[in-house]
Amino acid sequence: MAINLEDKKAIVAEVNEAAKAALSAVVADARGVTVSAMTGLRKEAREAGVYVRVVRNTLLKRAVADTEYSVLNDVFTGPTLIAFSTDHPGAAARLFKEFAKGQDKFEIKAAAFEGKFLAANQIDVLATLPTRNEAISQLMSVIQGATSKLARTLAAVREQKEAAAA
């Protein structure tokens, strides 16, 4: 289906805006995935704050040309599904990784984070990043553990001094 020039410009502008606002991007090949499965993926993506779109490769290359995601240009071959994480850097990677478990034909090609290219086998690094809330809770547990240890140490020192004085 032919797309006129105005529609192409609109697609490039839309994807470019999404890329500029994104924290990370993941590229996949969704050839052979059913429409209902793709609809489910798009629904999950909206809920996770991930922008997902199937875009022609030439338009995609133009859209990401002046962004940190231009490192992905070499993987824009065949049918390309791109996802931009807007809320959390690992959201798109986590979403695609979970989706790929149930879809044999869904293939994650690569990702980009902070201008760095991540091959398909490195997606786990991005997918396992803790969310903001998880990171805060991990930090709080470390702080709480250190404070508890300090309190126990001070109590032991006090008991030791009391025992020595008696």
Curated annotation (Swiss-Prot):
One of its GO terms (biological process) is translation. Forms part of the ribosomal stalk, playing a central role in the interaction of the ribosome with GTP-bound translation factors. One of its GO terms (cellular component) is large ribosomal subunit. Disulfide bonds: none annotated. Pfam families: Ribosomal_L10. Part of the ribosomal stalk of the 50S ribosomal subunit. The N-terminus interacts with L11 and the large rRNA to form the base of the stalk. The C-terminus forms an elongated spine to which L12 dimers bind in a sequential fashion forming a multimeric L10(L12)X complex. One of its GO terms (molecular function) is structural constituent of ribosome. InterPro entries: Ribosomal_uL10, Ribosomal_uL10-like_sf, Ribosomal_uL10_bac, Ribosomal_uL10_bac_type, Ribosomal_uL10_CS_bac. It comes from the Bacteria. This is Large ribosomal subunit protein uL10. The keyword Coiled coil does not apply. Keywords: Ribonucleoprotein, Ribosomal protein, RNA-binding, rRNA-binding. It comes from Pseudomonas fluorescens (strain SBW25). Belongs to the universal ribosomal protein uL10 family.
